[in-house]
Amino acid sequence: MAIYLDFENHIKEIQNEIELALIRGDEDAKEILEKRLDKEVKSIYSNLTDFQKLQLARHPDRPYAMDYIDLILKDKYEVFGDRHYNDDKAIVCFIGKIDNVPVVVIGEEKGRGTKNKLLRNFGMPNPCGYRKALKMAKFAEKFNLPILMLVDTAGAYPGIGAEERGQSEAIAKNLQEFASLKVPTISIIIGEGGSGGALAIAVADKLAMMEYSIFSVISPEGCAAILWDDPSKTEVAIKAMKITPRDLKEAGLIDDIILEPSKGAHRDKFSAANTIKEYFLDALRTIQQDPHFLDNRYQKLMSLGSFVESMN
């Protein structure tokens, strides 16, 4: 059963009317209602607030990494373990083909249903997850395979065990190693891009965000609690943090924004998956045609955080 957010109530009402028209066999009413639905969707989604975009990024029906992998990756083979400690189910690694292009895919997976969410640790990776991702990146480099990374996490797991096993070191090592990989790398934020937990698999030649995703150094709720000691200031924090694709593109922190279906990826995962596939293939061709892509990646990373101070 579809889940609707509060600002989608009118969409839900019209959708229910369409279903009733289908039951009655009233094609004329169905056609009228579908036109009304399209108009309502355009009206709502063209005027979303940043807080509503945050809600969409976290929508329970939003496609996760495994949804996209199942739809776009063929002849796939999953790889487990980090060769150091354990296998972290919050990060999934696959070898397969996207339109007959051999590729390594690394994704952060939140899981669906209570049992699977617990297995995936709600998409919050431990150090062994990031080390597994690095292992696969080195595999891709050895066999000259491009890498697609699907980012979707509230953040790296902050548990005591994770810290004892070197959470910060594992993330830092990934930043260092992914920056110098000798194969094309493409990272897409498909939902939440939370802090270092997201950044650990977001260092790439091309960094893109889905239209209704977010990328932030801390959750807006956490920011509000720290700065104002008031979690109700979340909407204020969102505006101050600039976490939406549009804001981050304007700041030069991401390369591209991937448009979603008219009702969002959570209403049409098949179209969203096809868009991701096409973006990956186009970006890969662009990178492969550039003999200086390694230098360009380095220069892009080195330019982050630079600023010019003017004296009046």
From Swiss-Prot:
Enzyme Commission number: 2.1.3.15
Domain CoA carboxyltransferase C-terminal: 36-286
InterPro entries: Acetyl_CoA_COase_a_su, ClpP/crotonase-like_dom_sf, COA_CT_C
Cellular localisation: Cytoplasm
PROSITE patterns cross-referenced by the UniProt entry: COA_CT_CTER
Matching Pfam families: ACCA
Catalytic activity, as annotated: N(6)-carboxybiotinyl-L-lysyl-[protein] + acetyl-CoA = N(6)-biotinyl-L-lysyl-[protein] + malonyl-CoA
GO cellular component labels: acetyl-CoA carboxylase complex
GO BP of this protein: fatty acid biosynthetic process; malonyl-CoA biosynthetic process
Keyword entries, A-Z: ATP-binding, Cytoplasm, Fatty acid biosynthesis, Fatty acid metabolism, Lipid biosynthesis, Lipid metabolism, Nucleotide-binding, Transferase
Associated pathway: Lipid metabolism; malonyl-CoA biosynthesis; malonyl-CoA from acetyl-CoA: step 1/1
Enzyme class label: transferase
GO MF annotation list: acetyl-CoA carboxylase activity; ATP binding; carboxyl- or carbamoyltransferase activity
Family statement: Belongs to the AccA family.
Function text: Component of the acetyl coenzyme A carboxylase (ACC) complex. First, biotin carboxylase catalyzes the carboxylation of biotin on its carrier protein (BCCP) and then the CO(2) group is transferred by the carboxyltransferase to acetyl-CoA to form malonyl-CoA.
Alphabetical list of PANTHER family matching this protein: ACETYL-COENZYME A CARBOXYLASE CARBOXYL TRANSFERASE SUBUNIT ALPHA, ACETYL-COENZYME A CARBOXYLASE CARBOXYL TRANSFERASE SUBUNIT ALPHA, CHLOROPLASTIC
Quaternary state and interactors: Acetyl-CoA carboxylase is a heterohexamer composed of biotin carboxyl carrier protein (AccB), biotin carboxylase (AccC) and two subunits each of ACCase subunit alpha (AccA) and ACCase subunit beta (AccD).
Protein name per Swiss-Prot or TrEMBL: Acetyl-coenzyme A carboxylase carboxyl transferase subunit alpha
UniProt source species: Helicobacter pylori (strain J99 / ATCC 700824) (Campylobacter pylori J99)
